[in-house]
Amino acid sequence: HIFGSGKAIMVIDNKILDNLTAQAKASPRLRMNLNFHQSLDEKCHRFLNAVEPGANIPVHRHPEKEESFVVLRGRIRVITYNDDGTIIENMVLNPSEGRYGVNVGKNVWHTVEALDPGSVIFECKEGPYVVHEEEGILIVDN
């Protein structure tokens, strides 16, 4: 994780998005965060998440936390699931079509998938960071 600059104001522009995208493409995970919060213990986690097609983001949930996604660039598929792995919602967020983001409620199984190279999401969720326990990942047959 990369943590924010600590500056009084940080402009989110193409230079920031391009730099983060280059780091995501070079990463084995095909994604990279730029955190605006200064530590994983902070109460509110705000970050950019550059996600490339093929990145593996397991189906997961946050039992006590909501999570918001806003697409800044590219197209992102968001899928939500029931406990048995059946799909509840399967939608594409695409700013050029007027679908900018979603708020995922507490305890909702979900994943995201980049459909375009260079996709970047702004994410916000309650902190502190909690590592997913084994029951925090849902195995879904594709």
Regions inferred by a protein language model and the residue ranges of each:
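Double-stranded beta-helix
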Residues: I2, I12, L20, T86-V92, ...
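Short glycine/proline-enriched turns and hinge-like loops at secondary-structure junctions
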Residues: R61-P63, V70-V71, A114-P117
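Conserved short histidine dyad/triad with adjacent acidic residue
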Residues: L48-E64
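A short, N-terminal "cap"/entry segment at the start of jelly-roll beta-barrel domains
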Residues: H1-C44, E89-P95, D141
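Short beta-strand His + acidic residue motifs that chelate non-heme Fe in jelly-roll/DSBH
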Residues: V59-H60, V78-T80, G101-V104, H110-L115, ...
